Amino acid sequence: MRRLFTICLLCALARSAFSAGVPADCRQLIVGIADAWESGEGRIQCFQRDGKAWQAVSPPQRVLFGKNGLAWGIGVAGQKEPGRHKAESDKRAPAGIFALGKVYTYETALPPGADYPFYTVSAADAWIEDPALPHYNEHIVIDLKNPPPWFKKQQMKQGDFAHHWKIEIRHNADSPQPGAGSAIFFHIQRGPNKHSSGCTTMPQPILLSIIRWLRAGANPHYALLPAAEYRAKWKAWGLPEPDLVSAL
C-alpha cells in the first residue's frame, strides 16, 4: 500500500511539473508569435478575460525578437521543455510564459491614462548581466560616491531613446540561474529591422499603448512561442484559442 501511495504521489508531482500555464488569476495576457524558432520577428496581441474565456483587445502588431530567434526561457512555463534553452549573449528571446514586472523609464510619471507600478531610472541604477557577478539578473542601486569596479559595464542605459520606456519580462527572475539570460524587456525598437539581443521590441506608440492598458491587479503575463508550439500547447497552458490569435 505504501509503495502504491508513493507511485501515485510521484505521478501527481510529474503531472504538476508539466501542467504549469497561465495562472488562474491572470486577466491580462500579451501573446507573441514567431513563425519558427529561428525567426527574429513576429507579432504580439493583447488579450483579457473576466471569467475563463480570453478576448482579443488589440489587433496584432509587428515586433522584433532576438536576432537569432527564440529559445526556451525560465518563467511560469517553458523551462522544463526539451530543446534549446536561453543562454546569456545568445541573441535569442526567451520562449514560454512569463510574469511582467514594473515599467522602467527616465520619466517621473507614467503616460496619461496609465496606472501601473513604475521606476524612474537614474545614474545610480544597474542591472547585472555578467554571470560571474553577484546579483546576476537583478536590479540594484549603487552609491555613486563609491561605485564598485564593475558598475560602468552594468549600469542601466542612460538617455537612450530605445530604453526610455520598457517593461520587465520576468525571465530567469526568481533565484536567477547564472548564465541563463538576463535583462529581458519590452522596449522601443531602434529601427524596423534592428533586432535586440533577446528583448521584444516595437515602435514607441505600441509600447505606450500597452503601458496604458496594463493593470497590476490583473496579474499580466507574456506568452511567447513559435506558431507550431502555440498550437500544440495552447490548451494545456490555458492560452487563447488559436482561432482568436490573429498572428497564427
Per-segment meaning from a language model:
Residues C199:
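Short cysteine clusters
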Residues M202:
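A conserved hydrophobic position in a structured secondary element of the catalytic/binding core
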Residues F18-S196, P205-L248:
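Cell wall/extracellular polymer interaction/catalysis modules
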Residues L4-L13:
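Sec-dependent N-terminal signal peptides
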